[in-house]
């Protein structure tokens, strides 16, 4: 099963999802880090650390972090002691914030931040040992094309880790998530980011995205091996892993 409908931040008929996603993140880039940590109560940092630990067995020297945003996943991956991390995103605004963060913390010697399209990666086959995506694949315009590109640029037996929001199924997390998504995220997102559509898009995009076994089946059909998933915080987020 794939996405049944295309959910875009602004819903403009004359613009692609990719264009609207880039515009949205440019609009909220200055407040993104604060809002991300505030709205998740800082739990997103714990989720990234858990995802990074799943790459320890690979001992990656080259890591690609797609939809890198301001680079939080790339920074978390420094724990693996790689020689090179490439963070790629389509939003210049997010990348600028990320570059400033890397320079300020002295990470710019290992982590490079590049503008690029996750569905048309400018890398040769089998280049990276590992690949990460944090809260980004649901923003792909063509999900399967993006997932195929991810597999292409990772070496044989390399590992791909995808961290993405999902929809809790059990009480009371299901009810908490529904309230948080419908009222808390749009309320604070609008007032702090000044972009009303951006944080209304978040729960809408999560609702439209295939998750759990549906997403695993897509990965397996595209050639990912040993696909597995792990629920976080009662199903608010999920870590998916696969091997090339």
What are these regions (language model features)?
Residues 19-20, 90, 163-218, 222, ...:
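C-terminal alpha-helical "lid/dimerization" subdomain adjacent to the S-adenosyl-L-methionine
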Residues 1-22:
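N-terminal auxiliary segments of SAM/dcSAM-dependent transferases
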Residues 216, 222-244:
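Core SAM-dependent methyltransferase catalytic element
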Residues 144-156:
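A short glycine-rich, Lys/Arg-flanked "PGG" loop and its adjoining helix->strand segment in the class I
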Residues 119-130:
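A short acidic, Gly/Pro-enriched loop at the edge of an enzyme's catalytic core
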Residues 62-120:
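Class I SAM-dependent methyltransferase SAM/SAH-binding core
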């Amino acid at each position: 099963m794939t996405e049944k409908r295309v959910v875009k931040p602004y819903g403009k008929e004359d613009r692609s999802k990719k264009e609207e996603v880039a515009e949205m993140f440019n609009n909220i880039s200055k407040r993104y880090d604060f809002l991300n940590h505030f709205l998740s109560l800082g739990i997103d940092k714990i989720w990234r650390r858990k995802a990074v630990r799943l790459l320890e067995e690979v001992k990656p020297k080259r890591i690609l972090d797609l939809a890198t945003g301001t680079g939080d996943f790339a920074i978390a991956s420094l724990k693996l002691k790689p020689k090179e991390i490439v963070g790629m995103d389509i939003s210049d605004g997010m990348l600028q914030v990320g570059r400033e963060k890397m320079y300020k913390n002295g990470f710019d010697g290992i982590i490079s931040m590049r503008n690029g399209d996750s569905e048309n990666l400018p890398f040769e086959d089998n280049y990276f040992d590992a690949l990460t995506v944090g809260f980004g694949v649901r923003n792909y315009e063509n999900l399967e094309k993006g997932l195929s590109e991810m597999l292409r640029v990772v070496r044989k037996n390399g590992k791909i880790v995808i961290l993405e929001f999902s929809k809790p199924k059990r009480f009371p997390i299901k009810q908490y998530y529904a309230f948080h998504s419908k009222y808390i995220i749009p309320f604070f997102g609008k007032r702090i980011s000044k972009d009303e559509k951006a944080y209304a898009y978040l729960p809408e995009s999560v609702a439209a995205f295939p998750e759990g076994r549906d997403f695993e089946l897509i990965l397996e059909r595209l050639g990912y091996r040993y696909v597995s998933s792990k629920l976080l915080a009662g199903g608010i987020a999920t870590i998916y892993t696969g091997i090339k």
